[in-house]
Amino acid sequence: MGRGGGMGNPVNVGIAVQADWENREFISNISLNVRRLFDFLLRFEATTKSKLASLNEKLDILERKLEVLEVQVGSATTNPSVFN
C-alpha cells in the first residue's frame, strides 16, 4: 500500500530541488550573457556610427579638394599660359 497525500520520497524531492536550482542558475547565466551581448552591440553601434560619420566628413573634404583640382587641371589644359 502506498501513502496518500505525502510529498514523496525525500531523496526525489531533494533531487528535484537541486535540478530546479541548477536550471535557474543556467537561465540566469544565459540572461546575463544576453544582456552583456546586447550592451556590447549598443556600444559597437554607437562607435561604428561615430567612426563612419568621421570618415564621411573626411571623404566629403577629399571630394571637394578633388573637384577643385579637376577644375584647375581643366583650366590649365585650356589655358597653358597659366604656368608661364
UniProtKB/Swiss-Prot annotation:
**What is the species of this protein?**
Zea mays (Maize)
Q: Which domain of life does this protein belong to?
A: Eukaryota
Q: Which family does it belong to?
A: Belongs to the BRK1 family.
Q: How does it assemble?
A: Binds SCAR.
**GO CC terms, sorted:** cytoskeleton; plasma membrane; SCAR complex
Tissue specificity of this protein: Expressed in expanding leaves, embryos, ear primordia, and roots. Very low expression in mature leaf tissue.
General function of this protein:
Promotes multiple, actin-dependent cell polarization events in the developing leaf epidermis. Involved in regulation of actin and microtubule organization. Part of a WAVE complex that activates the Arp2/3 complex.
A GO MF label: identical protein binding
Biological process (GO) annotations?
actin filament organization; cell motility; regulation of actin polymerization or depolymerization; trichome morphogenesis
Source taxonomy lineage?
A: Eukaryota, Viridiplantae, Streptophyta, Embryophyta, Tracheophyta
Q: Which cysteines are joined by disulfide bonds?
A: none
- The main location class comes to cytoplasm
Keywords on record: Coiled coil, Cytoplasm, Cytoskeleton
Q: Which residues form a coiled coil?
A: 45-79
Q: Which Gene3D superfamilies match?
A: 1.20.5.110
Where in or outside the cell it occurs: the entry states:
Cytoplasm, Cytoskeleton
What PANTHER family does this protein map onto?
A: PROTEIN BRICK1 (PTHR33668:SF1)
| Protein name, per record | Protein BRICK1
